[in-house]
C-alpha cells in the first residue's frame, strides 16, 4: 500500500530526531566560547571604568576617519561624495565627516532633518533622498528661520512622477519660491521613479515653461539591487547604467549639459563599482562609515 505524503513526512521527521538523539547532534552549537579580542576587551574595560552605566552608542573616531578616507578615495576628486544624513544623524558627527571628506554635499530623507541642516550647515548642497509629500515641502518653508541657507540654490527636490511635479509647481507658485527639481529614475529596481525616458520629456517641458518657479537640477538612480555585484562589467550593472544613460540622453536632447547637473547614484554597497565609470558624477554613501562589518565584502 502506498504511504501517504503526511505519514511519510512524519516518519521522516521522527527518523531525523532519532538519528540526532542516537548519534552526535551535528547542528548543536559549540559549547566553547571565545573572549573578546584585545580591541573589544579594551573598550569593554574603558566603558566599565568611565562609562555612564547605561547603553550608549560608541564611535571609534580613528576608525571612523579611516573609513571616511577610504570612501573619499573611492569617489575620487572628479566626482562629488554626497554624505547620507540618515546614516549619521548627529550634527557634530556630520561636521567631522564632511570636513575630513572635503564635501559639503548631503542627502536628506526627512523634513525635520532638512530644517536642521539648513540651520546648522548654511553652505550645504542638499539632495532629497526620497520624494517628499508636498505638505512636507510646505512645512519646510513654514519652519524656516532667518538662516542664510538659500533653498532656491541649495536644495534639489526629488520628484518621481509628473503628478508630484505638478503639485510642487503649484506650491512654488503659491509660495512665490523657486524649486530645483531632481528626477528619480528607475534603473532596474522597479520600486518607484520614472519608468522610462519618455516620461521625463514631458516633465522637462513643464519645468522649462516656468523658469521663475522651477529649474531642472539632475537625476537620481537608486540601485540597491546591485548589492553583491563585484564589477562594473557584470550584466546587471551594465543594464542599470544603460537605463541611466537613456535618461541622460533625453536631458541632453532637451538642451541641458549633463556635466553641469547632479547625476546621483550608488550607496555604501555599490560605491566602488563606479570607480572607473564616469556616467554618474555624484555618489551617495553614509552607512559604510559607521557600520563597516555590514560592508565587509569582496568589493569593499
Where are these regions (language model features)?
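Aromatic/hydrophobic pocket-lining residues that form the small-molecule binding cavity
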Residues: 64, 68, 161, 165, ...
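A charged N-terminal "starter" segment
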Residues: 2-143
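Active-site loop/helix belt of alpha/beta enzymes
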Residues: 13, 180, 186-300
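Short secondary-structure junction motifs
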Residues: 17-18, 78, 152, 178, ...
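A conserved hydrophobic position in a structured secondary element of the catalytic/binding core
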Residues: 59, 160, 285
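Active-site-proximal beta-alpha core segment in soluble small-molecule metabolic enzymes
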Residues: 83-228
Amino acid at each position: 500500500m502506498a504511504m501517504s505524503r503526511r505519514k511519510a513526512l512524519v516518519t521522516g521527521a521522527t527518523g531525523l530526531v532519532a538519528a540526532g538523539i542516537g548519534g552526535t547532534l551535528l547542528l548543536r552549537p559549540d559549547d566553547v566560547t571565545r573572549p573578546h579580542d584585545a580591541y573589544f576587551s579594551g573598550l569593554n574595560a574603558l566603558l566599565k571604568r568611565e562609562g555612564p552605566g547605561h547603553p550608549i552608542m560608541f564611535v571609534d573616531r580613528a576608525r571612523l576617519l579611516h573609513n571616511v578616507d577610504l570612501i573619499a578615495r573611492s569617489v575620487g576628486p572628479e566626482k562629488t561624495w554626497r554624505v547620507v544624513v540618515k546614516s549619521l544623524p548627529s550634527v557634530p558627527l556630520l561636521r567631522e565627516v564632511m570636513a575630513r571628506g572635503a564635501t559639503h554635499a548631503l542627502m536628506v530623507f526627512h523634513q525635520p532633518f532638512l530644517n536642521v541642516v539648513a540651520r546648522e550647515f548654511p553652505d550645504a548642497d542638499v539632495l532629497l533622498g526620497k520624494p517628499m509629500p508636498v505638505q512636507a515641502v510646505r512645512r519646510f518653508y513654514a519652519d524656516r528661520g532667518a538662516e542664510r541657507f538659500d533653498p532656491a540654490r541649495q536644495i534639489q527636490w526629488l520628484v518621481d512622477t509628473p503628478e508630484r511635479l505638478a503639485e510642487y509647481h503649484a506650491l512654488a507658485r503659491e509660495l512665490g519660491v523657486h524649486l530645483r527639481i531632481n528626477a528619480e529614475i528607475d534603473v532596474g529596481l522597479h520600486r518607484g521613479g520614472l519608468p522610462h525616458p519618455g516620461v521625463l520629456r514631458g516633465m522637462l517641458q513643464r519645468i522649462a515653461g516656468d523658469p521663475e518657479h522651477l529649474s531642472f537640477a539632475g537625476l537620481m538612480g537608486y540601485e540597491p539591487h546591485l548589492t553583491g555585484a563585484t564589477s562594473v562589467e557584470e550584466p546587471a550593472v551594465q543594464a542599470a547604467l544603460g537605463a541611466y544613460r537613456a535618461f541622460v540622453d533625453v536631458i541632453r536632447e532637451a538642451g541641458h549639459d549633463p556635466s553641469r547637473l547632479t547625476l546621483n547614484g550608488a550607496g555604501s554597497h555599490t560605491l566602488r563599482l563606479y570607480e572607473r565609470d564616469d556616467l554618474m558624477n555624484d555618489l551617495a554613501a553614509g552607512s559604510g562609515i559607521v557600520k563597516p562589518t555590514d560592508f565587509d565584502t569582496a568589493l569593499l
